[in-house]
């Protein structure tokens, strides 16, 4: 489907991308409903990614509000295209989930015993499971070791046997998911609804990250293999169906896609004059391909880059002013103070007084968010 009416330009898409994502701050539940998915990351620099994302979109938001209020909200933690938080209705689209590997009999028996243990207690911290079963240590993804119980709980959560009931000090506390099947039973799906569910998941990803270059749309559909592995074989068909129903334009040789109901050239998509520090996982800057197309410079997330090789900083926050990401900031909270350093893609800060006033206002908002003011 091609967009009709006024020809769409890259400037239209850039303004549309910012304005549609930075909606008027609302309640926590409504903000997550509007976003559809909030990516999580455990690094605090100066707060977790999910908190840094929500502070721009939730009125009066403070660091840690999501973790504190999660048990009372209709939300789930799970893997979608990345790991994060979803409204329960979206979460249910991915379940029952068929894992990519079949458990051995021994593993299934371990899972059954753990499931019964958690069901009896209601909600369980991983250390309680480890103390009761003493599963030992296993190698983790980073080359070190972790408790085998923790790894088993992670897998049981992924398979839909458990849900995250709450967090304690950042650690997931698990409960039995209401619709959990037996751990050694193969998950089944309603084949008649598989295509519609897959389409809904693709639309959810598009809604979160639009407008999308074709390469990013392809990437997101590939990443759905993590959230819905049972429908991996349908990904190519789902991508083809998406390209048929989404609006589309080719600009400077790049194919772009966005929800068909939206008109990026509309005057309603008008970013404000504010200055904002964004998390690297914010939907405005998450797509590094789109970032370079929109703003003409390369942002890199360097938390896992050796310090001598970093160019921007450990956890550089993209710096948005109006409809441009003009640089980055490294922000830390230490000894009750906010400490900041900035870099600019153009080599120096804008001279306009409006920028400096806006930056001071953003830093004050950050202090309040972190409880420093």
Which residue ranges define each predicted feature?
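Long, charged, low-complexity, helical-prone intrinsically disordered regions
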Residues: 1-373
């Amino acid at each position: 489907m091609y967009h009709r009416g006024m020809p769409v330009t890259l400037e239209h898409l850039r303004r549309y991308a910012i304005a549609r994502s930075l909606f008027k701050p609302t309640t926590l539940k409504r903000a997550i409903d509007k976003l559809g998915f909030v990516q999580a990351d455990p690094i605090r620099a100066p707060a977790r990614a999910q908190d840094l994302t929500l502070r721009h979109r939730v009125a009066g938001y403070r660091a840690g509000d999501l973790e504190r209020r999660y048990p009372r909200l209709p939300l789930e933690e799970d893997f979608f295209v990345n790991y994060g938080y979803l409204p329960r209705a979206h979460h249910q689209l991915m379940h029952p989930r068929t894992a990519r590997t079949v458990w051995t009999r021994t593993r299934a028996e371990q899972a059954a015993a753990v499931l019964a243990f958690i069901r009896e207690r209601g909600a369980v911290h991983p250390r309680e499971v480890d103390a009761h079963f003493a599963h030992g240590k296993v190698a983790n993804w980073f080359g070190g070791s972790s408790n085998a119980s923790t790894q088993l709980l992670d897998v049981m959560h992924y398979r839909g046997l458990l849900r995250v009931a709450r967090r304690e000090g950042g650690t997931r506390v698990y409960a039995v998911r209401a619709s959990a099947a037996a751990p050694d039973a193969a998950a089944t799906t309603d084949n008649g609804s598989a295509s519609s569910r897959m389409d809904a998941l693709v639309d959810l990803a598009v809604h979160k990250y639009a407008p999308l270059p074709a390469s990013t749309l392809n990437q997101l559909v590939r990443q759905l293999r993590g959230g819905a592995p049972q429908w991996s074989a349908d990904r190519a068909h789902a991508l083809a169906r998406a390209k048929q129903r989404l609006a589309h334009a080719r600009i400077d040789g790049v194919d772009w896609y966005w929800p068909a109901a939206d008109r990026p050239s509309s005057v309603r998509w008008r970013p404000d004059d504010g200055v904002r520090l964004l998390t690297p996982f914010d939907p405005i800057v998450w797509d590094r391909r789109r970032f370079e197309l929109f703003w003409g410079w390369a942002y890199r997330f360097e938390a896992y880059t050796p310090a001598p090789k970093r160019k921007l900083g450990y956890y550089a926050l993209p710096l948005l002013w109006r409809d441009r990401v003009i640089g980055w900031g490294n922000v830390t909270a230490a000894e009750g103070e906010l400490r900041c350093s900035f870099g600019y893609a153009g080599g120096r800060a804008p001279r306009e007084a409006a920028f400096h006033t806006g930056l001071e206002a953003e830093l004050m908002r950050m202090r309040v968010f972190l409880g420093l003011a």
